[in-house]
Design a protein with these regions (language model features):
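N-terminal subdomain of nucleotide-sugar transferases
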Residues: 1-63, 109, 252-257
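Active-site proximal beta-strand in glycosyltransferases
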Residues: 3, 128-156
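Conserved catalytic-core segment of nucleotide-activated headgroup transferases in glycan assembly
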Residues: 22, 207-279, 289-294, 298-299
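Membrane-proximal helix-turn-helix segments that form the acceptor-binding/catalytic region
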Residues: 28, 100-105, 141, 153-185
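Short hydrophobic beta-strand element within catalytic cores of glycosyltransferases
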Residues: 317-320, 327-331
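Conserved acidic donor-binding segment of nucleotide-sugar-dependent glycosyltransferases
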Residues: 346-353, 360-361
Length: 361
């Protein structure tokens, strides 16, 4: 079997400055299941250096060819002029072209499958008519902005509404441009696949759950004593800021009843203020902005909290927690597309009050 992957990012074991882990582990699975030869053509937007690229080639036994981004795009990034994308009809990276010499090289291999990773590159399938093409999106970006426009807290200002409406229009325009009935569009989100199909009736959309990868199958599930270790993971950013503020405000209010039973850790950037707040009101709290071995640090805790307000697809940090034996307390968006059951293998909550109630149970 011969497979050619065209990707925005260079595959890596864990996400590195992009959603680069999914293709890595899919390639690894293919290699274990078939006698497969894999060539990767990467725009390397996650900026791996030569040594890192060679290491990935060695780990997966693949060949990686680097592709150039347009010079104007590189200049725009270098001069921090990304805001100029508002003058473009399509999303920024969709302007990455595939030179004819690489098209010819790929065709000469007679690959069984042309695999494209990243929605912005989906239009590259046009170069390989007659070949079996699969595009791993992996999320539907237009659904993300559609969801944003439905959030009251995200649309309080006119500028916000215009920003999300414009991005929605960009991705919808791109989807109309590239969607072909003889190409398979692969998603790791059920609603992503359904929304894409709804908006593009001729689309052949496929939903497959995101694979687990970095996990410890031998971990003994047992809460720490005398204090249960509660973990907030991921960057404190727009995706989770509103929900996390709600959860943590309620936690702060209930300090008298909970500070004796829970130890709090924030693992990720941006949590400094909340760590200081909880520490001042009596919680045992610490902030780890970066862990050299993320999985090892994860396994030191009992419960993982993910208050994600909006998003699409599958949330990698949530998958990591489940795979490593932590009880996940999370919002519906945090837990979507993961094969778990509320009250059995996870606890699903919608707001800060429900979060606190789950800690008292």
């Amino acid at each position: 079997m011969r497979l050619t992957l065209i990707s925005l990012s260079t595959p890596t074991f864990n996400n590195c400055r992009a959603a680069s882990a999914l293709p890595y582990h899919l390639i690894s699975s293919v290699k274990k299941s078939f006698s497969a030869s894999v060539d990767v053509y990467s725009y390397n937007i996650n900026e791996l250096d030569t040594n890192q690229i060679e290491q990935v080639e060695k780990e997966l036994n693949i060949t990686i060819h680097l592709l150039d981004k347009p010079k104007w795009l590189k200049l725009m990034m270098m001069l921090h002029l990304v805001f100029l994308r508002v003058f473009l009809k399509y999303p920024l990276y969709s302007y990455c072209s595939l030179p004819q010499k690489h098209i010819d090289a790929i065709k000469s291999t007679h690959s069984d499958v042309i695999w494209i990773y990243g929605e912005e590159l989906a239009n590259h399938s046009k170069y390989f008519e007659g070949s079996k093409c699969i595009v791993t999106m992996p999320d539907c970006e237009s659904l993300y902005y559609y969801r944003m426009l439905r959030q009251p807290w995200a649309t309080m200002r006119l500028l916000q509404i215009l920003k999300y409406a414009f991005a929605y229009w960009q991705y919808k325009s791109l989807e109309r441009l590239f969607c072909e009935k003889d190409v398979i569009y692969h998603f790791v989100g059920k609603e992503d696949a359904d929304f894409f199909k709804l908006m593009n009736g001729q689309a052949n959309s496929l939903f497959m759950r995101h694979p687990l990868y970095a996990y410890n199958s031998e971990k003994t599930i047992k809460f720490h004593q005398p204090k249960i270790k509660l973990l907030f993971t991921g960057r404190y950013d727009f995706y989770c800021q509103h929900g996390s503020d709600d959860f943590l405000s309620e936690l702060e209010k209930n300090r008298n009843g909970l500070s004796s039973y829970f130890e709090i850790t924030f693992l990720g950037k941006g949590w400094e203020k909340w760590n200081e707040k909880l520490h001042k009101v009596g919680f045992q709290s610490q902030h780890i902005s970066f862990a050299p071995d993320y999985i090892a640090e994860l396994q030191n805790h009992d419960i993982q909290v993910n208050a994600i307000d909006v998003g699409t697809g599958t949330k990698g940090k949530v998958l990591d927690g489940i795979a490593n034996g932590l009880l996940i307390i999370g919002t519906p968006y945090a837990l979507e597309n993961i094969s778990v059951k509320n009250g059995d293998s996870c606890v699903m909550v919608s707001n800060g009050i429900e979060f606190i109630q789950s800690l008292y149970v």
